[in-house]
Amino acid sequence: MPRPKRRFAGELTEGRTGPGGPRVAILRPQTYMNEAGRSAGPARGSYRLELDRVAVIHDEIELPFGDVRVRLGGGLGGHNGLRSLRRDLGSPDFQRVRVGVGRPPSADPEAVSAYVLGKWRQPRGEVADLIERAADETERLVLDIPR
């Protein structure tokens, strides 16, 4: 993929998945996570994408560390980034690659916030494996490959 450009309050790169493959655009919002919709909403409008063609990769504390699941739509689970995306995309019915990061021992909102915003507690190799699995699932979704 080409070097990203600054657009839509984020870093955007466009290209194909391979020779003759589908065109894709990858947007990495440069907003705070809880304002990601400010980036994704205008990008979706500019590309005139149907909502089910928008894929969001996000952390998921309701999944154990290492699990990666894909689904269309669903609840927000208290995730402020998803709330922002729903608001600015107009609906929660976008594709999601849910990356399990596990839940902290405390349910206190401040502890949960510190957990998801803090450094990884798992060994570097396990984190690299998780990122690779998330990338694989995202590629399957984009290429429409059944599981």
Model-derived regions, located:
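Nucleotide and nucleotide-moiety/phosphate-recognizing core
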Residues: 1-73, 83-98, 105-113, 123-147
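Conserved TIR/SEFIR loop-to-helix hotspot centered on a Trp-containing motif
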Residues: 76
